[in-house]
Amino acid sequence: MRVNYIFVTGGVVSSLGKGIATASLAAVLEARGLSVTIIKLDPYINMDPGTISPVQHGEVFITEDGAETDLDLGHYERFIRTKMRHHNNFTAGKIYADVLRKERRGDYLGATIQIIPHVTDTIKKWLIAGAFGHDVLLVEIGGTVGDIESLPFLEAIRQMVMEVNREQTLYIHLTLVPFIAVSGELKTKPTQHSVKELLSIGIQPDILICRSDRVISNSERKKISLFCNVPKQAIIALQDVDSIYKIPALLKDQGLDNYICKRFNLNCPEANLSDWEEVIYYQEHPIGEVTVGMVGKYIELVDAYKSVTEALKHAGIKNRFIVNIRLINSQDVEKLGIEKTLKGLDAILVPGGFGYRGVEGKILSAQYARENNIPYFGICLGMQVALIEFARHVAGMPEANSTEFVTNCKCPVIALITECKDENGIFITHNDNTNLGGTMRLGNQACYLIKGSLTHQIYGKSTILERHRHRYEVNNMLLKHITHAGLSCVGFSKKNNLVEVIEYPNHPWFIGSQFHPEFNSTPREGHPLFIGFIKAAIEYQHRHNKLI
């Protein structure tokens, strides 16, 4: 099967939106009936982003097979139907580790190990393997052309021409065309210099995607075409839009998919973007709006909760409501109090996280939602703080806590997987080798829902598959005291020994999930839990307005 390769690089500045542009192009090609996948190459030395601070790097996106990957893979899954896996994200650290492992084994037979050919050959081998079974592979190279870290990756994609033929490769370069207010002009010089930098590496871009905050005129496109040696029809203008889900249509309207299909000699029907047109229609024709408070500790960088914020927007689209997300620092809840931080919300969501900082603010948020019948959705740590709060204030366990926060906790309602006991005080059979990542539960896990529960009603089925990323669990030894006080455990892992979902029946909508449903939400389908959560927020708003 012939595979065609599209390599996407970026220039001038970082954070131009290569990931979204790549995903949007993939969506248009997929809409033409092509089988498409995407690989992200990250130039940092970390093995994966799993241990990088969310404030520095953004969220860690978890794939079905449990890989901790770059947040761009979340964009890919939201735009195309192909599911990402561990081979869809490679870092420089992972590449170097593989090369060094082979060197220690003697695979190179005493050769001097160098960037060229050993590192570049490994990159090419992994790209070709990742493309297997697809019509088109798009490869996004992280970083900016000119960065020293990106050079091995750029050299590898330059060499791909000789590996798979020039007719099967295409280079797209994403650049910035800034508007200079003083002169009132868009400037093409940064794009020209960026292409010159790329040419010095040996790569002539076939297509330029020019980012700008306004429409790029015909004369400016001609100028870029002349100085960058790229055909005018291959100069794509990508101006700022109010919704990223409009970008597939923007690319199609400029004929980018036709140009690519012609270049690859692909005979396929016109792109059918009716799904995306429906998404945009509902997004632009809301019948109301609600405000959701998201209480977290990494709110200074919105990308730290990217999948959660997108899932809330998807649920808004499905309910035809605008979802206004108020980012609330959980430490502010502790310091400033509920009146100044949580008032005026239609729903409260506490997302996942690690560490003790800000936890008491999250517990206060769960308590406020429970006592005031405000819809509450706790994800991962958000479920755990809801359980701790209930244990302290309803189940008569004032010292309830997690061993993550208090090592010698007298009442450990949450504990490490290896510390958890069943209701008879016997350790649950988990060890460092039980799950991928040692004691970390990662990736898809089966969950069984109790019939008659709200969560079962929302999903409409008894068995679900959701993605996990955590190492602390509900301690079953203390669970009876909590459930006798009124909290329901309605979702369990495969062996029924790990709590996956909790509910508070004496509340309109109070759900906590140990898994991360946000990773399975897409703009076209949404996710049942998020859709139900926003529906509950709408109903709360209506009830609240009637009382006023």
UniProtKB/Swiss-Prot annotation:
Entry's Gene Ontology cellular component terms: cytosol
The answer to keyword Magnesium applying to this record is yes
Pfam families the record matches: CTP_synth_N (PF06418), GATase (PF00117)
Q: In which pathway does it act?
A: Pyrimidine metabolism; CTP biosynthesis via de novo pathway; CTP from UDP: step 2/2
Give the span(s) annotated as Amidoligase domain: 1-266
The UniProt record lists the Glutamine amidotransferase type-1 domain at: 291-543
| Sample GO molecular function, one term | ATP binding
Give the highest taxon in the source lineage: Bacteria
- Asked if the keyword RNA-binding belongs to this entry, the reply reads no
Q: Entry's HAMAP family?
A: PyrG
Q: What else is known?
A: CTPSs have evolved a hybrid strategy for distinguishing between UTP and CTP. The overlapping regions of the product feedback inhibitory and substrate sites recognize a common feature in both compounds, the triphosphate moiety. To differentiate isosteric substrate and product pyrimidine rings, an additional pocket far from the expected kinase/ligase catalytic site, specifically recognizes the cytosine and ribose portions of the product inhibitor.
**Cross-referenced PANTHER family:** CTP SYNTHASE, CTP SYNTHASE-RELATED
Subunit details: Homotetramer.
What name does UniProt use for this protein? CTP synthase
**Annotated organism of origin:** Blochmanniella pennsylvanica (strain BPEN)
Species lineage = Bacteria, Pseudomonadati, Pseudomonadota, Gammaproteobacteria, Enterobacterales
